[in-house]
Regions:
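Short, contiguous acidic/charged loop-to-helix segments that flank catalytic cores in large enzymes
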Residues: 136-142, 171-175, 179
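Conserved, mostly hydrophobic/aromatic
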Residues: 5, 19, 44, 75, ...
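Glycine-rich, proline-tolerant flexible connector loops at the mouths of alpha/beta enzymes
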Residues: 31-34, 165-177
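A conserved active-site cap/scaffold subdomain adjacent to cofactor or substrate pockets
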Residues: 11-41, 45
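Short, proline-enriched alpha-helix->beta-strand connector loops that line the catalytic pocket
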Residues: 1-4, 134-135
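Alpha-helix-loop-beta-strand connector modules within alpha/beta enzyme cores
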Residues: 182-196
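An alpha-helical appendage that flanks or caps ligand/catalytic pockets
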Residues: 35-160, 193-218
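Hydrophobic faces of well-ordered beta-strands that scaffold small-molecule active sites
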Residues: 5-8, 24-29, 58-65, 163-165
């Protein structure tokens, strides 16, 4: 026996089949958000259909950067510098390491699934400002109501059952990270829990029926 297995990926076509062969969860780790990620995710669901496998949304996980504040304006004031730091500084990887020979198959290259790190990704983000990051879906940010609405849209658009929200971004300090996490947990997450509730989720970890916890040590 083992806990459910979740496999991270960035668009390799072979990973889709490897995951489906083993009935694991495929987790697309997207730094550029749900609008750009839709093409890869749709490719995954197309492959699921081609293989005659059920399209339970919980087969898919998706990483989305999220910033929550009291209002849309305060979200920009609090998070903009840290988001810019992330995209302009933290995706810097020497090109030969980001796209080394043999790292991706010819099949994946032909499908034009581009890497999210390295020189190309860095250049693409250099000129973007807060409004661009929001409008292009790189981040979902704003008041709790704004974030709830956009995450609901993203979950349904992608048909994703395991929405993984990245709440510490770039140079974000501890106090702001805690605020982001608390606002998300209290004012956003409860509204998202029933999305896809009509589907069973066998890939979510379950507690052992006959567990015998060890006593807490001194």
């Amino acid at each position: 026996p083992h806990p459910p297995v979740w496999i991270p990926g960035s668009g390799s076509l072979e990973t889709w089949d490897w995951v489906l062969d083993r009935d694991y969860v495929y987790c697309y780790l997207s730094y550029f958000g749900y609008l750009r990620g839709l093409r890869v995710v749709q490719g995954f669901w197309d492959r699921v259909a081609q293989r005659g496998i059920d399209d339970n949304p919980h087969r898919l996980g998706f990483l989305q950067l999220v910033c929550v504040s009291e209002t849309d304006a305060s979200a920009e004031a609090e998070y903009a510098e840290h988001v810019k730091y992330f995209y302009r500084k933290m995706l810097r990887i020497h090109p030969p390491f980001a796209e080394s020979p043999g790292y991706r198959s010819i099949r994946s290259i032909r499908e034009s699934i581009r890497p999210q790190i390295g020189e190309e990704a860095q250049k693409a983000a250099q000129e973007l400002e807060w409004k661009d990051f929001v409008d292009q879906g790189h981040i979902i940010a704003g008041s709790p109501a704004t974030v709830r609405d956009q995450l609901t849209e993203a979950a349904k658009m992608l048909r994703v059952g395991h929405l993984m929200c990245l709440l510490h971004i770039g140079s974000m300090p501890k106090d702001l990270t805690l605020k982001n996490t608390e606002l998300f947990a209290k004012e956003v997450m409860p509204s998202l829990k029933d999305i896809w509730s009509e589907y069973l989720d066998p890939w979510w970890p379950q507690r052992l029926n006959q567990a015998h916890p060890a006593p807490v040590g001194d």
